[in-house]
């Protein structure tokens, strides 16, 4: 994959993120959810929603929520997926939905060649920075998730600049 991704766009060069930096935002959102909201979250089930909801209300941090909810039946990874989907407002139907477009974030000369071919052969629409995709519902979800993910950035202002480059239309000639 490295041959298709410019080095400036690799994970190593991304704005640093960590759970710790956004933990309060995560817990605030999860604590504000009603039990009925948990039923909508992907990766849950009848007993799990109730168990996690109680842990979120009682535990002081994310790690303790996981510890209080974890069991043989509900492993840590499933709990993490449930909490992330609940935080982002993603239900099972949305999770199973096929992506309606591909957002191109960056490319070099080799990528330009690949994109030219992809435009001819692709089943999905290719969207560049500043373009609004045809599916408004999915686009709104994408923007909401990006905004919430930004709360986990060590330097939120740098992440905000990256998001602005992706979603804002470039200024044309005056």
Predicted segments with their positions:
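Active-site cores that bind ATP or allylic diphosphates and position pyrophosphate for catalysis
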Residues: 1-174
């Amino acid at each position: 994959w490295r041959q298709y991704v410019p080095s400036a766009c690799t994970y190593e060069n991304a704005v640093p993120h960590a759970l710790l930096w956004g933990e309060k935002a995560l817990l605030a959102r999860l604590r504000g959810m009603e039990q009925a909201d948990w039923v909508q979250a992907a990766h849950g089930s009848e007993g799990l929603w109730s168990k996690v909801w109680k842990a979120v209300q009682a535990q002081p941090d994310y790690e303790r929520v996981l510890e209080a909810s974890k069991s043989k039946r509900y492993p840590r990874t499933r709990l993490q997926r449930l909490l992330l989907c609940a935080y982002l407002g993603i239900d099972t139907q949305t999770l199973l939905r096929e992506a309606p477009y591909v957002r191109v974030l960056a490319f070099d000369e080799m990528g330009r060649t690949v994109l030219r071919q992809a435009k001819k052969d692709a089943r999905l629409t290719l969207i560049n920075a500043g373009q609004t995709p045809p599916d408004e519902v999915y686009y709104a979800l994408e923007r909401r998730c990006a905004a919430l993910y930004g709360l986990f950035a060590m330097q939120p202002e740098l992440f905000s600049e990256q998001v602005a480059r992706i979603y804002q239309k470039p200024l044309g000639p005056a």
